[in-house]
Amino acid sequence: LSKTAKFSNGKWKIENLNKLLLYCSNFEIANIGKCKFELYNYQKTAVKELLDIDEGSLIVASCGAGKTLIAIDLYLELLSRFKIKGPGLIVVKSSLKVQWYHEVLKFSDLTPSIIETTAKAKKKFDSQFTGDLLICNYETLNDDLVRERLLNMNIDYVFADEVQYVKNYAAKRSKSLYKFNKIKYTFGATATPIQKNPRDIFGIYRFIKKDIFTNINTFDKRYVKKNNLGFIIGSRNERELTDKIRDNLIIRTKDEVSSHLPKLIVTQKYCNLGPKIQKISDQLLEEIKELKSMQEAMMDRFNTIEEARLNKEFTDLDNQILMKQAFAQEITITDELLSYSDSVAAKQYVTGEKSEKIELFLDLVESIISEGDKVCVFSKFRSLQDILIAHLQKRFKNIEIAQVHGGLSSEQRYNEVQKFSSQKTCNILLSSGAGNEGINLSTAKYMIEMEPADSYLVQTQRHGRIERASSIHDTAFVYQLIANNSY
């Protein structure tokens, strides 16, 4: 009660009934839950809250909170209450279409259908518009024939997953989605909170509830802070902006769903670089430092960094710095990555020395799979998967390995995840950044990060693959592999 009400004159005054229901899991929420699977209390209260709002809304929920289940049940609830009549539209990232298709089948008796562009669909163009929940990616809506066909179907329900993809109001995919903003029930879901640029709110709500903000010029004058050069540096009137969207926003924080998530234990595992690789690492860091000094000396010739970036000599130095930074990152794992590189410059830094981090990785995998547990392995370097597979096959006989990367189709990725999740003999899944979002690895007890994530957001997305409400484990473990004295 203390979280949702105030005590005054001997009585509790409830300020937010939905929050009270959220924290009181023993309260029965009647007539909510039309899916095959029982919804958690925080999911039921989310659906109830959205039904009470009774128009477009933004759903912010942590990774693993089960936004897919909320979307499907919300559609069923609106259908059962005769608020909507026909099919609904689910808009997702391209890599998640197949995942959504199978989850609709898993969680309901609805018929899903994936919509492709005119060129891809060809002869089956008409048949793909039959179904209860139509699924397409954002870019598919750029296809004039697809978009017009959907608009003419008088769809009453649109749910945009990873809705931060339309935060740039001027992008083509954003404008295509905005064509559907006259529909009453337009929902967007994200695990990524709005961060620095207040215009993100304008872009997202242009789809969810177009009348909240009249136009971008008025929005900028009231809520956007710019410097003398016209660059956005922050926001203004934040409280007023929050109040504007409050009635069309529901949030489920990690604390609110944590009782349904496994406890996540993150541990750093350190190793040293071999002497030859350490020497190369030091050399690269020194070369990067020297290039940056050259850039700083050049800045006296320019008034702004933007002006400097128009200078070829300056941008050449920029490119060299980025290239050497990439090399410095790669050798913290193994200089075999440099051997795989198309860059001729990379080859001069190859030592052929055994990687201490690869050895640490193999030892961790051995201890994990010897207990019969599953582990997912993340790295932003796609070519590392081939290297790790070679080492794993050398260490372990008849080992089965699943892979997720950008070179696979949505169907192939889904099949790889299913193989890892359902087959007892497949205990290892290797993933590039393509697996940071949208895949459910609830059977994995362990995660290994071969290098630190580039940002806290990427790290949160990675961890969200195993920190899920559907996890079969009470505790999940993340090992972050870090090389001492390296980039």
Spans of features found by a protein language model:
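Conserved pre-motif I regulatory segment
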Residues: N18-V60
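SF2 helicase/translocase ATPase core recognition
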Residues: I183-F219, S258-L285, L429-Y487
